[in-house]
Amino acid sequence: MQALLLVLVLFIVQIYLLPGNGISLESLAVDKRCKCVKVTNRPTGLGPIIAVDVIPPGIHCRRTEIIFALKKNRKVCVDPEAPWVQQFIKKLERQHRTRKENLMVGEDGGKSTVGPVKNTIEPTPPTIGSHICL
């Protein structure tokens, strides 16, 4: 009787773990929780920011998370609604647009006799869900 119960339990577990039954394999491989337990809304004392991670809301977390990577492998979660964070992200977007425009113009200022320089790889501006290295 116990062997039959064990076989039945194993069969049910196997059915639920098969792909296509509401469990995505991706969700099994990623952390299902928010990465930021606590956020700061103060810019003081952060130091140089090396990279920015913007993680959109999803099944793992209901809120947008912004993580700044600092020197010495420190990571700080910041409040996405804080005005200084929004200004910082806008500044990064402006810098990105400027770099993109400079790539399109070319090194000679667009005075090439061959023709306009075409950018074959179009960089995208930093958006939610992106990782930005500074």
Swiss-Prot record:
Pfam families: IL8 (PF00048)
Major subcellular site: secreted
GO MF assignments: chemokine activity
GO biological process per UniProt: defense response; immune response
Keywords: Evasion of host immunity by viral interleukin-like protein, Host-virus interaction, Secreted, Signal, Viral immunoevasion
InterPro entries: Chemokine_b/g/d (IPR039809), Chemokine_CXC (IPR001089), Chemokine_IL8-like_dom (IPR001811), CXC_Chemokine_domain (IPR033899), Interleukin_8-like_sf (IPR036048)
Subcellular location per the Swiss-Prot or TrEMBL entry: Secreted
Keyword Magnesium found: no
UniProt record similarity statement: Belongs to the intercrine alpha (chemokine CxC) family.
Protein name as catalogued: Viral interleukin-8 homolog
Protein's organism: Gallid herpesvirus 2 (strain Chicken/Md5/ATCC VR-987) (GaHV-2)
